[in-house]
């Protein structure tokens, strides 16, 4: 699959067979891959099938600028599924062809707002979302922080054609002593300080959709009440005698593994079963590099419409090999930082990227094991209000910053006390990660 670059005829994918395939600027017939790239030699590289190894191999045909596999220059190497190949300024990804999978360039599902990307993974998620949108069943959106779960919830609501509003709520940001009142409402005098009645978020979403983001943060007693609402389609505000019927579609989202939470008694199995009637998975950005180039172009047009900010092949390759712990939000932040550094536009090389993106992937022969630089992994990244990093993300940041809580707080745009609260929550000791410890 072509991720980045200029392929003759605008082709976006090539099916490999048993016959050798050459790549270059002048390779003849259509079974070969012709690249309109001045950095590519006339006959640059060849991919061939080995009957002995039952694997594809690639070899450099004596090119001027080399062949790179997962960021490392090679002469001859086995190709594995998921590997990135760079020749000049053109980057490919080797993928297995799945039966029934949408082809690159296939029409995207009709959802508003439209999602930016062309990976099969994203397209499958959008197709599923479009199919289940007209129903009234609960939907659970799974995916790590920054993948656009809130945007998908909004798209499902619009496609449902429900007449009411979409009411979003971040469960992690609700005060623990007010969650029930916020969701279900209360009557005047129901508790100390209840000087007036409150309708609650469920009634605010009447005939519409209630989006419960970070649902894994809800306490067990609230989970039980939520389950009853889903089953009875009615609510009882705090202090009320009678129940009120509601017509609300619930869309929930989480970056947690709720199956794991159920197994450890932190999430109700019956609520989990109810929510998983319809599940849409949004994969992390690191697993769908096909979406990087269109997302980059989208953010450049959005944030710097008068700037022409382009990427070199080496810079794109480094981005495709990056782990993207904060996903699409991190990419947007990278574009913003690049536009600030180059307001007039131009081409970004690999040296213009954050240090963590410049090191080669570990494990490929020839990669430098000691290439991890000091400093933050990306430009400063601000979390949205109420957003909470997952334990894995927090541990990764503690490792990157060698246990320096002050630097982590600056990186996330949060107070140090909040970082310490998260560390205690996830039982992470920053001292264990400081230089010279243990």
Give the residues covered by each predicted segment.
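Dynamic helix-loop-helix/coil hinge segments at AAA+ ATPase domain boundaries and subdomain interfaces
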Residues: 103-127, 177, 322, 380-386
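Conserved AAA+/SF3 P-loop NTPase catalytic/coupling segment centered on the Walker-B
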Residues: 139, 155, 176-181, 202-233, ...
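Conserved RecA-like P-loop NTPase ATPase core
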Residues: 125, 147, 169, 183, ...
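C-terminal boundary/linker segments immediately following FHA domains
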Residues: 23, 48-57, 64, 68-118
